[in-house]
Structure formats: structure tokens, C-alpha cells
Curated annotation (Swiss-Prot):
The keyword Cytoplasm applies. Its EC number is 2.7.1.23. This is NAD kinase. GO terms for cellular component: cytoplasm. GO terms for molecular function: ATP binding; metal ion binding; NAD+ kinase activity. Involved in the regulation of the intracellular balance of NAD and NADP, and is a key enzyme in the biosynthesis of NADP. Catalyzes specifically the phosphorylation on 2'-hydroxyl of the adenosine moiety of NAD to yield NADP. It comes from the Archaea. Belongs to the NAD kinase family. It catalyses: NAD(+) + ATP = ADP + NADP(+) + H(+). The keyword Transferase applies. Keywords: ATP-binding, Cytoplasm, Kinase, NAD, NADP, Nucleotide-binding, Transferase. GO terms for biological process: NAD metabolic process; NADP biosynthetic process. Its cofactor is a divalent metal cation.
Amino acid sequence: MKLLLMSRIDSEETLAYTRTLGIDLENVGFQIIYDTATASALEVNGVPLSSADPDAVVAIGGDGTILLCIQQMNIQRPIIGINRGEVGFLADLEPEEAFSFLKELKPGFPVERRMRIDLSVDGKPLGTALNEAVIVTSRPAKMLRFSVLVDGVRAEQFRGDGLLISTPTGSTAYAMSAGGPIIDPRIEGFLLVPLAPYMLSSRPHLICATRTLAVRLEASKPAHLVLDGQRTIDLGDQATIEMTRSPEPAQFIDVNRNFFSKVEQKLRNL
């Protein structure tokens, strides 16, 4: 089997761990390749993640590394994260157990598919998010005015600092910090969480993933759209952001662990 290793490159300890893990996996018969950035840091040959064809991808770092990895894949490959960050809700393995798990990986391993969101602005495709898309004001202390449309029908109108649109996977990330609920990732839907809404009646909404969702900026105030904390797009006046369930979900290697048990453990360690 061919595994691609992608490491956070701002940590010498993580890079050293990645180098050792790659050697150990090669010694038990795996073909190991590295993405370009990791390879450069390790001074070995690498391949762009966008054109690589591994059987699985191993992301070594925090949730940001895993999100970046998924963003860079043109075709979604099975992925597993090794936590070398702070919390690591998306990382299913800790460093001390990773080699023992990976060396037993065989073709046909189980995969859990996670919903992603395709986004466009005024009809122009922008990209895909696994955790969340966040619409925020570009000017601190200046509120935005939104309309939320579901299948073309206005369902909500409010003012606030911004609006967070999350997947169930992202419900343990920014959405949780903003007061949203924790959602089982096997559920598919759009979680809308207002950020500092002016009216207390503006509450989180969970909308079925089969619906088409749009958010319209109702006033001419500068705003940004941020995808998974990785990419920021300037929004024009009175822009409309359209969202649909992506036909290509993320694929996480299933380690057969209870989601809520993992969440409880991660939250306890905060």
C-alpha cells in the first residue's frame, strides 16, 4: 500500500516524528511518499498532494493540518490524522499509537464519509469547506444585515457580527465556541450559527442537507468569507453566497471509536 505523509512544518519535533514514522512504515512494507512542503522540510523528494495517488493520506499535526490536506486534494482520498496539535477533534490517533494502527492497515479498510459544503458567490464557484464557512464583517464593531434563504424562500433575517455555516463535522470547532450544538457527524445538514446577533431571538438552525441554502448581504458593508480558516475571500456589496452539499465528501479512515466518547475526552483535556 502507498501512504502519503503530510506534516505540519512549523514544528521540528513533528517533522522528526514524521521522518521516523515514514521509516518505520517503509520497514514493514509500505510505500511512503510525502507532499511537497513536507518533503522540502525533510530534504527528501516529494509530490504535490493535488496530483498524488496514494491509497491513504496520513496528516500529522492539528486540525488545521488535516483541513489543509483535505483542501489540497483534487480527488478525496481516505485520510487519517495523528494529533500533534492542541486539541485535534479531527485527529483519531495519538502519536504513541499511530504506528501500531497503521502497520495493520490493509486494502479494503473501512471509511467514514463526512459531508462537505460547496460554495459559490453570485453564481461563481469558490471552493469547498469541511468544517465551516464564516461570513464576518470587515470592520470591527460594525454589524452586517443578512437574509437566509432556504430553497429560495426567506427563512430568517437578522443583524450581527457574522454568520457561521457549519457541517456536523465542524460543530465541534468554531460553531461550538459560538454557542452551537454538537452534532453527530453521521447526520447531514447545514448548521447556521449567528455570531453576536443583535436580537436574542436569532438562534442556531439545523437545515437538511438536501436543501439549497443562500445567504444574502442586505447592506453595502464590507465583509469576508472564510473557508475552514484556510482561505479568505472579500465579498462585494449585497453579495449572495450559495451553499449546497458537495457530491464529494471527505473520507476518514474509520478507527472504530465512539464519536461522543472522543468528544468527551477532547473537551476534558481543554
